[in-house]
From Swiss-Prot:
Oligomer and partners: UreD, UreF and UreG form a complex that acts as a GTP-hydrolysis-dependent molecular chaperone, activating the urease apoprotein by helping to assemble the nickel containing metallocenter of UreC. The UreE protein probably delivers the nickel.
Gene coding for it: ureD3
InterPro entries given in the database record: UreD (IPR002669)
Key words, A-Z: Chaperone, Cytoplasm, Nickel insertion
Any one GO cellular component localisation term in the record: cytoplasm
Listed GO MF terms: nickel cation binding
Protein source organism: Bradyrhizobium sp. (strain ORS 278)
Function text: Required for maturation of urease via the functional incorporation of the urease nickel metallocenter.
One Pfam family per UniProt: UreD
Family statement drawn from the similarity comment of this UniProt entry: Belongs to the UreD family.
Principal location listed in the UniProt entry: cytoplasm
Compartment list: Cytoplasm
The name this protein goes by in its record: Urease accessory protein UreD 3
Length: 280
């Protein structure tokens, strides 16, 4: 769901809504509809992969400095039948002091039959006092593929000794008939961080929902992340939904590289080709 959205500072935060709709037309995936307002900005679409010219890659950018207390962000992504779409971010998102009210980001994702959708965000950088909740609901057709990656890294720029407040995430994946396929949820507070993560200061999840013949092996996912200096563990998702990869890293940079490497393994299995690196 590392966020594609960032909002400006305000005394009570701000509410921001964005919607992206991707269709398949003329042998390519195209951005058919967008509703994105300040402080968000959508780059032009890129078709970066010669072996998969139908795959549309899009970067969401922001004119602001991160997520602030009281921010309420909503993103709606719809990927139509047979379309292929990768949404990513230009850089990590700073999460500022939540001042007791925190920030909330909601994502609603729809992936139609035969479609591929990947939403991979750079880590959320949690400053002292930061509080962020992520809530994603995805509806995925039986023969479609969804990859969602998000995570966080801790940073205390002034060496104040204060911990972040809380980071929580929830992902629910449903079939078009409403059947709940997967429910993944977690929460960690700054005071609990070392007990939960040990010596690590960054963590991420990569969740892949796909038919069995379009999944990578558990070993290949783990090796891709471990090879970047992270510690990773993968397992089968409930209800034969796909795979879940957990990644721990010493810092945000290592986490980004490990998550990206694992995503490329997942994408190669799902699409049948090796994707080019997304420059940032």
């Amino acid at each position: 769901m590392r966020s594609p959205l960032q909002s400006c500072s305000a005394s009570e935060g701000r509410a921001v809504e964005a919607a992206l709709s991707v269709d398949h037309a003329g042998g390519r995936s195209v951005l058919r509809r967008q509703n994105v307002g300040y402080p968000l900005h959508v780059t032009r679409g890129f078709h970066l992969d010669a072996a998969r010219p139908d795959l549309l890659t899009l970067y969401l950018q922001s004119a602001s400095g991160g997520l602030y207390a009281g921010d309420r962000i909503a993103l709606d992504v719809s990927v139509a039948r047979d379309a292929a779409f990768h949404l990513t971010t230009q850089a990590a998102t700073v999460v500022h002091d939540g001042r007791g009210i925190g920030a909330l980001q909601r994502q609603t994702i729809t992936v139609d039959s035969g479609a591929f959708c990947a939403i991979t965000t750079d880590p959320y950088v949690l400053f002292p006092g930061a509080e962020l909740a992520l809530d994603t609901v995805a509806t995925v057709a039986d023969d479609a593929v969804l990859c969602v990656a998000d995570g966080f890294a801790v940073h205390d720029p002034r060496a104040s000794g204060r911990a972040f407040s809380e980071f929580s995430g929830r992902l629910r994946v449903l079939r078009p008939d409403g059947h709940l396929l997967l429910h993944d949820a977690g929460r960690v507070s700054g005071d609990e961080l070392h007990g939960a993560l040990g010596p690590f200061a960054a963590a991420a999840n990569l969740i892949i929902v796909a038919p069995p013949d379009r999944l990578p092996s558990v070993k290949s996912l783990q090796q891709a992340a471990d090879g970047c200096g992270a510690l990773a563990g993968a397992s089968r998702a409930p209800n034969d939904a796909g795979l879940v990869l957990r990644i721990l890293a010493p810092d945000g940079g290592t986490l980004s590289r490990a998550t990206d490497a694992a995503f490329h393994v997942a994408a190669a299995a799902a699409l049948g080709v090796t994707l080019s690196r997304r420059r940032k």
